[in-house]
Amino acid sequence: MGIFDWKHWIVILIVVVLVFGTKKLKGLGSDVGESIKGFRKAMNDDDKPAEQPAPQPQQAQAAPQGSPLNQPHTIDAQAHKVDEPIRKDQV
């Protein structure tokens, strides 16, 4: 005999049926079932490989030797001080 015995579950079930009604519970059950089916379908679709793999794009032309594409770079600029507005309640 744990905290929730089978008798407790029956009482909870009766209270839920009285509060929500059978129509809402049927609708909720069908919505949950459809959600589970959709989830399973999506999971199965992810497992299957694509039927026709997309053709791989041709490689772009190599960058010239002096190009800094892969080199780290620094932006030289100065920060400007921002004037914060004065709060009226502090004056």
From Swiss-Prot:
Its subcellular locations are:
Cell inner membrane
GO-annotated biological processes: protein transport by the Tat complex
Q: Which family does it belong to?
A: Belongs to the TatA/E family.
State the GO CC annotations. TAT protein transport complex
UniProt keyword terms in alphabetical order? Cell inner membrane, Cell membrane, Membrane, Protein transport, Translocation, Transmembrane, Transmembrane helix, Transport
Q: Which Gene3D superfamilies match?
A: 1.20.5.3310
Tell me the subunit arrangement.
The Tat system comprises two distinct complexes: a TatABC complex, containing multiple copies of TatA, TatB and TatC subunits, and a separate TatA complex, containing only TatA subunits. Substrates initially bind to the TatABC complex, which probably triggers association of the separate TatA complex to form the active translocon.
InterPro entries tied to this protein: TatA/B/E, TatA/E
Q: Where is this region: Disordered?
A: 42-91
Pfam families referenced in this protein's UniProt entry, alphabetically: TatA_B_E (PF02416)
* Name of the featured protein: Sec-independent protein translocase protein TatA
Q: Where is the composition biased (Basic and acidic residues)?
A: 78-91
State its role.
Answer: Part of the twin-arginine translocation (Tat) system that transports large folded proteins containing a characteristic twin-arginine motif in their signal peptide across membranes. TatA could form the protein-conducting channel of the Tat system.
Traced from the root, the source organism's taxonomic lineage reads: Bacteria, Pseudomonadati, Pseudomonadota, Gammaproteobacteria, Pseudomonadales
Its transmembrane ranges are 1-21
Q: What is its main location?
A: membrane
In the bilayer, the protein is annotated as: Single-pass membrane protein
What are the recorded GO MF terms, alphabetically? protein transmembrane transporter activity
